[in-house]
């Protein structure tokens, strides 16, 4: 585990700017943050090496590509099957997060489905994998 790194105002400003637009050029970041371009280059490189910045990604609007419903499912998983079940569920392209949790459920799954038929398929074919002993599914309203 990497020790925690103290971030100063410049680091935080760079991170905020990248969160707003990960494609921003270093020249643009330099103007926005108010420091030299070399400072931006060095700070970004250091934060990448320290694991603070772990990558850059595209964020899409799920509804614009047909994923109209977000669901949350709680799963009870048989002892000794947790990792295997979670890996199989995470491999489904509709699933975007799988969490270990405390409480009544062993795992919480977040997924996006196209419609009710797709939700029915996910529920019947993924949330009933060998090792899942019980599940509940909720449609996210907002």
Task: Pin down the residues of each PLM region.
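A compositional/biophysical signature of low hydrophobicity enriched in polar/charged and small residues
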Residues: 1-142
């Amino acid at each position: 585990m990497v020790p925690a790194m103290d971030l100063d105002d410049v680091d935080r400003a760079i991170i905020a700017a990248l969160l707003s637009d990960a494609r921003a050029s270093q020249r643009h970041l330099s103007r926005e943050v108010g420091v030299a371009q070399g400072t931006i280059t060095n700070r970004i490189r250091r934060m990448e090496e320290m694991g603070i910045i772990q990558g850059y990604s595209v964020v899409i609007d799920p509804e614009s590509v047909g994923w109209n419903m977000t669901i949350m499912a709680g799963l009870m998983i048989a002892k000794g099957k947790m990792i295997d079940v979670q890996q199989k569920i995470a491999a489904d392209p509709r699933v975007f997060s799988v969490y270990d949790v405390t409480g009544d459920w062993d795992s919480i799954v977040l997924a996006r489905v196209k419609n009710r038929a797709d939700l029915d398929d996910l529920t019947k074919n993924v949330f009933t994998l060998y090792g899942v002993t019980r599940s509940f599914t909720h449609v996210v309203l907002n």
